[in-house]
């Protein structure tokens, strides 16, 4: 779930993971701090960050050998899981008044990550490619309407960025 525009949970340690060459060191720069670890024999690394408070957008830089990964516009706020069937999958763009709602959406308050529907019987640590998007502009139309209206109601009350992780698939069992 790591991409530009992602939202991380405030006031809690956050886990950042990656993969690389076994035995190679990893330097992670985030929120004015440096974290170091080593890629394990399975080719994976993990860093637990310190808890952070909301503030200006941040950047994450991970460096391992000649490889550098940069993640921009990282927000610290509240992250919510939005899971369900057709009622959660129904998008803002499906409403008759979608264009009016699109004009009212406040840019910079909420972002979302929609997990692609993927049926696989073999467990995997990797997710199909997706990215965090703003809950405004043209991207708003693809967002779950239930998730959007929840964020629209909650964000002004708590006053921090909202991250919505949407996992919705019509006609499937919730478990």
Residue ranges and their predicted role:
Residues 1-175:
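Cell-envelope and extracellular/periplasmic
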């Amino acid at each position: 779930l790591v991409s530009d525009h992602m939202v991380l949970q405030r006031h809690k340690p956050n886990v950042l993971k990656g993969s690389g060459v076994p035995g190679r060191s990893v330097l992670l720069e985030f929120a004015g701090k440096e974290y170091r670890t080593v890629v394990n024999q399975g080719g994976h690394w993990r860093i637990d960050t310190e808890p952070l408070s909301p503030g200006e957008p941040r950047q994450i830089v991970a460096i391992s050998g000649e490889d550098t990964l940069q993640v921009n516009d990282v927000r610290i706020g509240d992250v919510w899981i939005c899971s369900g069937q057709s009622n959660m999958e129904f998008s803002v763009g499906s409403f008759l008044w979608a264009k009016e709602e699109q004009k009212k959406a406040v840019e910079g308050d909420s972002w979302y990550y929609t997990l692609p529907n993927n049926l696989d019987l073999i467990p995997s640590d990797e997710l199909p490619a997706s990215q965090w998007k703003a809950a405004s502009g043209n991207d708003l139309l693809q967002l779950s309407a239930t998730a959007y209206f929840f964020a629209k109601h909650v964000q002004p009350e708590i006053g921090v960025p909202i991250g919505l992780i949407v996992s919705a698939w019509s006609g499937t069992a919730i478990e």
